[in-house]
Curated annotation (Swiss-Prot):
Active site: 99, 102
UniProt xrefs under SUPFAM superfamilies: Xylose isomerase-like
Protein name (Swiss-Prot/TrEMBL): Xylose isomerase
Species the sequence originates in: Bacillus sp. (strain LW2)
Domain of life: Bacteria
Broad EC category: isomerase
Length: 441
């Protein structure tokens, strides 16, 4: 049955359009550089927020109006698949993502859970045969059920470690079967509340053992998708071990895992860690670890993960700047790990939200491309660091000096003259480029 029968396929109508159910800036076939927008942006729908989210919060029950919610159990799971692929087709979106429990309910036993998953994966596989929408990534939910109260791979209970491994094993089999481009690990419960009851070294060692086993099993079954770590500093756990890109990178390097993983970077997780979105993207990029993106934004006045749809054009521009500098996202994409606000409870709000996010990143792509083409920031940065291309600076970079030679050089210096960083001028240029793209017809 149709679930969005009052919605037509969303088309590009251009900036002058007043149609709220049309793209104003995202034209999938438009070339930006040597790729189309669709190839650059690789948009993805998050199954959990879009099809299972009910709008509930700590202060109120679910209020979302969803046509499929008249069903329950496995009938509900099947209805969600039907609704999802109708949504994908009408939005003309190339990818989707899910956790295992998003697509099928857990059973009384692990075997029953596997059975439920198999039934729904069969159904998804059939839909994918005639759909352009592919699986960007899947993952195992290792945080919702009470068994994971003390963590999954970092749990103090070895039985929980084993159960988590079984879920990831099944998840990797599903990833291979559905042709997933990536597989994600997000450790929402991998951390601690207090050191008074925590063996941190054992927990970190066990987390590494767990990830090595996952790498080994992926090789065993021939799954060649990219493994992704998704950093987050807190929520639900006070001290999470994958706090930010730098922390997670140190972990991967320490345990010999760096060659097998890249990062799935979420904008709102960056701000929770006290960073900008583009900071986390830059750290990952310069270390060759930028794999995929969870596209959303947080509310700077709130201290939690609000998962809003991305509409901040400065943020999307600076994010796309890093992504283009990275040569794209490879097998990754821009997954809308975002939810409509509790007050936006009607089905069509799902379309308005995704259109807003897709248009915002389309603008960001075009602005970032022009900034890079015109070398707006590159030229300034090259001039700013010019002292390292000649004289003593070049010797520092080439590693041909020591403290003795540097001291001798410093003793010969007079008053050192620095130059302005011109931050305000550069922000004005960013504004100019953004406004020019938005004003273009």
């Amino acid at each position: 049955m149709p679930y969005f029968d009052n919605i037509s396929t969303i088309a590009y109508e251009g900036p002058a359009s007043k149609n709220p159910l049309a793209f104003k800036f995202y034209n999938p076939e438009e070339k930006v550089g040597d790729k189309t927008m669709e190839e650059h942006l690789r948009f993805s729908v998050a199954y959990w927020h879009t099809f299972t989210g009910d709008g509930s919060d700590p202060f109120g029950a679910g209020n979302m109006i969803r046509p499929w919610n008249k069903y329950s159990g496995m009938d509900l799971a099947k209805a969600r698949v039907e609704a999802a692929f109708e949504f994908f087709e009408k939005l003309n979106i190339p990818f989707f993502c899910f956790h295992d429990v998003d697509i099928a309910p857990e059973g009384e036993t692990l075997k029953e859970t596997y059975k439920n998953l198999d039934i729904i994966v069969d159904m998804i596989e059939e839909y994918m045969k005639t759909s352009k929408t592919k699986l960007l990534w899947n993952t195992a939910n290792l945080f919702t059920h009470p068994r994971f109260v003390h963590g999954a791979a970092t749990s103090c209970n070895a039985d929980v470690f084993a159960y988590a491994a079984a879920k990831v094993k099944k998840g990797l089999e599903i990833a291979k079967r559905l042709g997933a481009e990536n597989y994600v690990f997000w450790g929402g419960r991998e951390g601690y509340e207090t050191l008074l009851n925590t063996d941190m070294k054992l927990e970190l060692d066990n987390l590494a053992r767990f990830l090595h086993m996952a790498v080994d099993y992926a090789k065993e079954i021939g799954f060649d998708g990219q493994f992704l770590i998704e950093p987050k500093p807190k929520e639900p756990t006070k001290h999470q071990y994958d706090f930010d890109v730098a922390t997670a990178l140190a972990f991967l390097q320490t345990y010999g895992l760096k060659d097998y993983f890249k990062f799935n970077i979420e904008a709102n997780h960056a701000t929770l860690a006290g960073h900008t979105f583009e900071h986390e993207l830059r750290v990952a990029r310069i270390h060759g670890m930028l794999g995929s993106v969870d596209a959303n934004q947080g509310d700077m006045l709130l201290g939690w993960d609000t998962d809003e749809f991305p509409t901040d054009l400065y943020s999307t521009t600076l994010a796309m700047y890093e992504i283009l500098k990275n040569g794209g996202l490879g097998r990754g994409g821009l997954n809308f790990d975002a939810k409509v606000r509790r007050g936006s409870f009607e089905p069509e709000d799902l379309f308005y939200a995704h259109i807003a996010g897709m248009d915002s990143f389309a603008v960001g792509l075009k602005v970032a491309h022009r900034l890079i083409e015109d070398r707006v920031f590159d030229e300034f940065i090259e001039e700013r660091y010019k002292s390292y291309t000649e004289g003593i600076g070049r010797e520092i970079v080439e590693g041909t000096v020591d403290f003795h030679k540097l001291e001798a050089h410093a003793l010969q210096l007079g008053e050192i003259q620095n130059q302005s960083g011109r931050q305000e001028r550069l922000k004005t240029l960013l504004n100019q480029y953004l406004l020019e793209v938005c004003a273009a017809r």
